[in-house]
Amino acid sequence: MNSTMLRVTNRIIERSRDTRAAYLARINQAKTDTVHRAQLACGNLAHGFAACQADDKASLKSMLRNNIAIITSYNDMLSAHQPYEHYPEIIRKALHSANAVGQVAGGVPAMCDGVTQGQDGMELSLLSREVIAMSAAIGLSHNMFDGALYLGVCDKIVPGLTMAALSFGHLPSVFIPSGPMASGLPNKEKVRIRQLYAEGKVDRMALLESEAASYHAPGTCTFYGTANTNQMVVEFMGMQLPGSSFVHPDAPLREALTAAAARKVTRMTGNGNEWMPLGKMFDEKVVVNGIVALLATGGSTNHTMHLVAMARAAGIIINWDDFSDLSDVVPLLARLYPNGPADINHFQAAGGVPVLVRELLKGGLLNEDVHTVAGFGLSRYTLEPWLNNGELDWREGATAPLDDQVIATFEKPFSRHGGTKVLSGNLGRAVMKTSAVPVENQVIEAPAVVFESQHDVLPAFEAGLLDKDCVVVVRHQGPKANGMPELHKLMPPLGVLLDRRFKIALVTDGRLSGASGKVPSAIHVTPEAYDGGLLAKVRDGDLIRVNGQTGELTLLVDEAELAARQPHIPDLSASRVGTGREMFGALREKLSGAEQGATCITF
C-alpha cells in the first residue's frame, strides 16, 4: 500500500470516528430480524400491496420473501435516463426468479445540465441533488422493503440517490447504470464549431447540426463529464456490478447485467446468504477508492463536492486536503475528452474499468480489502462481464491497456499526479482540473476583469475587451448566491482567447463540471463572494496569480488596501424568482460551502 494512501485513509478514519460510530449505531437500530413489512399494521400492509398482482400479494402476505424497492429517475427527455423506461419489468422478472418481489417505490427528478446550460434552470441544478435525496427517502420511508435498486446515471442524480441510500443504510443496495450512447461527432470537432460560432464564423443552424450529431441517441453523453465520472466512481466504490458502467443501453449484455443486479440484491438481504447493507459496505476505505478513481481519470470537478456530501451521509468526513494529498501520488492513467480526444467508448474498448483497477492495485493506490456488491475484495473489479452461450458470466479483463493513448500503465502514466489540483491563497480555496490544461497554461499572473454574471462575458469578448492577458473573474455564482450554476458558456470565448495566444485564466465561485476544458480555471472558490469571501473585493485591474502547479490562488493587492475596501454585493433578485427558483430560497440559504459539499442536508 502506498504510504500516502495509508496515511490519508487512516486520517479519515480517525477524523470520522465519532460520526461514523453514530451512523453505524443508527443503521443497526433500523435493522430487523424479519422482513421489514412485518412491522406494519394490517391496514398499512394492505395499502402497500393493493395494486400488486395476485402472486406478489401472496408473497408479500407470507412474510417470507424479500420485497425490493426500485427507485427510478426515468424520464424520456434525458438521453441517459430514457433507457430506464423498461427496467422495472426486467427487474421484476429477475426478482421473481429469485423468489422475491419488486415495487417501484418512487421516482426522483432528473434534470439535464446539457439542456439547462446558460439558462435560468441551471440555478436549480445543484439544488436538485438535495431534492433527489429527499424524494428517494420518501419512497423508501414506507418500510415495505428489504433492499433497494437505484436507477440513475447523470450529474446530480447518482450523488443524490447515494445520499438517500445511505440514509437507509440498513438496506442492501445496488446501483444500475444505463450505459453510454454510441460515439457521434468527435468531441474535438464539436468544440471547434462552438468556437467558430463564438467568433461569428458559423451560424446557429451549423452549431445545432454539430450538437445534434454529438448527442444523438439514448445513453449517456460520451465525453468524460459528471455523468460518466459518476459511473466510474461508483464502480470503483463497489456499488454496482463489475464492468457494468459502460455497456451500451441496447446491448444484450446490458439487460443481463440489469437482471443480475436484481438477483444480487436479494442475496445481500438479511435472509439471503451474502448479507451486506450499504451503510456497512460504504466505509472510509471505499470513499478513498472513489477519490482515487476521480483523480486517476481526471474526472469531473463536481465530485470534489459530491463525494464530500456522499461520505457525510455515511458519517465519514473528508475535505479537500484529502483530495490534494492523494492527487500528489495518484497518477493520471486515462485520457478522455476533455483531457484528450478519446470518449468513454474508446475507454471501454481500451480495457475499461477492469484494467484501470488492475493498474492502480498494482501501484498500491487502492484499498483492496473492501466489501462490494460483488463480494469482498476490489480485485473482483478486474473481471469483465460477457455472455457465455447467452448466460451472464465474468472473466479476467485485459491484463494491460489495449490502447496506450487512452489508458496508461502505472509505470508510464500520462502524468505523475492526479487530474485535480487544490488551490489555496488569500482568495480562499479552489479546485482546478489540471488534466485538461496544458502545463504551459497552468500558471498565470495577470490583471483581473470582473463580471457578476457569465452572460456579461460574451458581449465583452465580442467587443474586444478581453483581447489581452487577463484573469476573468465571475463571482456571486456560489451556492448561497444563486445555487452555484455551471458556467459552460464561458468556455468557447475563453478558448478562442487562448488560441489567440493570450494568457487567460478563470476564477469563479461557480462550477464548470466535467467539461472543464483547456482554460485554466480556479473554480468552487470558497468562501464564496456572497458569503464573506475576498472575491467580493476584487476590482478590475487587480493582479491575480493562479498557479495550477504549486496550488496557489493569490490576489496581489496590499492587505491594508483590501481591509479598506467594501465588498461588492450586486442585486441578485433576478436569481430569486422565475423557473421555479422562488420555491428553493429556503434550501439555497442553507447550503454549505463548496468544500463542505454544498449541501443543505444535516446528517
Where are the regions that the model predicts?
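Contiguous domain-boundary segments centered on the initiation and propagation of an alpha-helix
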Residues: 129-136, 143-148, 458-466
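Catalytic or ion-coupling anion/metal-binding cores of large enzyme and transporter domains
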Residues: 1-76, 80, 89-108, 119-121, ...
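N-terminal small/polar loop signature for handling phosphorylated ligands or for N-terminal nucleophile
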Residues: 105-143
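A short, small-residue-rich loop immediately preceding and capping a beta-strand
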Residues: 139-161, 174-177
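Acidic/charged coordination and interface sites in well-structured regions
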Residues: 86
